[in-house]
């Protein structure tokens, strides 16, 4: 079952987000297995992230790569809200 993961870190700038994205790409996780959609939004130090993964298992596997990267740049992701997806409407 697909899941949505919403991250609202206590503080994250666009520059910090961009740095994490570059580090994920270098680690071979720029396009992780099972991720269907990814978006980042917000302003200032209030950047937020929403992902949709095809399964909890693939999301958890991505987390095994993501969390050490976040720790290496001292970024606290906060506690994500993770819920099953009821529907996705495109367009």
Regions found by a protein language model. Give the residues of each.
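Short S/T/G/P-rich N-terminal loop/turn motif that feeds into the first structured element of a domain
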Residues: 1-50, 54-68, 75-91
């Amino acid at each position: 079952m697909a899941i949505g993961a919403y991250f609202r870190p206590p503080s994250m700038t666009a520059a910090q987000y961009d740095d994490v994205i570059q580090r994920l790409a270098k680690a071979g996780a720029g396009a992780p297995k099972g991720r269907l959609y990814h978006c980042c939004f917000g302003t200032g130090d209030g950047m937020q992230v929403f992902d949709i993964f095809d399964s909890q298992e693939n999301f958890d596997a991505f987390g095994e790569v993501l969390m050490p990267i976040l720790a290496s740049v001292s970024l606290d992701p906060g506690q994500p809200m993770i819920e099953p997806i009821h529907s996705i409407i495109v367009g």
